Amino acid sequence: MLTAATNAASSCSGLLIPPSNALITYSLASGGTSVAALFMAGYIPGIIWALCCCVVGVLLAVKLGYKGTPGKFDWKNLGVCTLRALPSLSLIIVVIGGVFSATEGSAIAVVYALVLAFCYRSINLKSLWKIIVDSAKMSGMVVFLVGVSNILGWVMAFLQIPDAVAAALLSLTSNKYIILLIMNVILLVSGTFMDVTPAILIFTPLFLPICQSFGMSTIQFGLILVYNLCIGNITPPVGNALFVGIKVGRTSLSKVMPYMLMYYVAIIGGLLLVTFIPAVSTALPQAMGLM
C-alpha cells in the first residue's frame, strides 16, 4: 500500500519538471508565454513536490518500522548494481531523450522493456498473455477516465460554469490573497474530475486576467495552475495517476488513501509556497534572462 501511494504521489512531479506537455499546453492557452521560461520555472516547484514526497515517505517508513539494508554502505557493490541496472535505466533515455515523440517513445519503450524482461527471465511466453490482458484493462481504465473528464469539461464550458465562477469570485472580494486561496480551491476540486489538458484550456483564460490585474506574472500563474491540476491527478474520483498506481500495486483505494492523506497535506503545503512566494516560480527564469 505504501509503495502504491508513494509512486502515485511522486509521479505527477513530472508534469512540473521539463519536458512537460502541460506547460506547453498552458503556453498556447495563455497566448504564447515563453515555453523556455515555463520549463525553467518548473524546476523549483517540481523539486518542492519531490521533497514533500521524500519527507512523507521517510516519516511513513519510520512509523511502519521499515529498516534499511543491513550492513555498511559499499561503493563496490553500488558500482556492480549500477552496471547491472544500466539496461533498465536506459529506458529513461528512450522515453525522454528527445529522439522520438511522446507517443512513439512510449511504444518503443514498451518493446524495449519487453525484450529486457525476457533477457532477465522475469517473464515467459506463458505469462505474456496475462500481462497483455492486464495492460489492456489498465489502458481501458485510463482511457475511460480521460474520456469522462473531457465530457465533464465540455459540459462545464457549454453551461458557462467557469465564467459564472470567475464573476462570483470577483464579486466576493478584492483581496488578492483571498482570491488566490479561493482560486486554488476551485482548481483543486476541478482537477479531481477533469483531465489536465481541458482544465488548462478552460481555466487559463478565466483566471489569468484576474491574476494579472494584481500584478502576478503569467509564469507564476501557469505553475500554480499546473501544480493544482497535478494534485487533482492523484485525487479521487478520477485521479488517473492514483488509480494506475493502485492497479499496478494490486491494492485498493481504501487501503491506499490513509497513506495518501499525508502526501496531500505535504504537497498542498508546497502549493502554498508556489502561490504566495513568487520567487519560487520566477527566480530561475529571471536569473536566466527569460523574463
Per-region residue spans from a language model:
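Alpha-helical transmembrane segments of multi-pass membrane transport proteins
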Residues: M1-M291
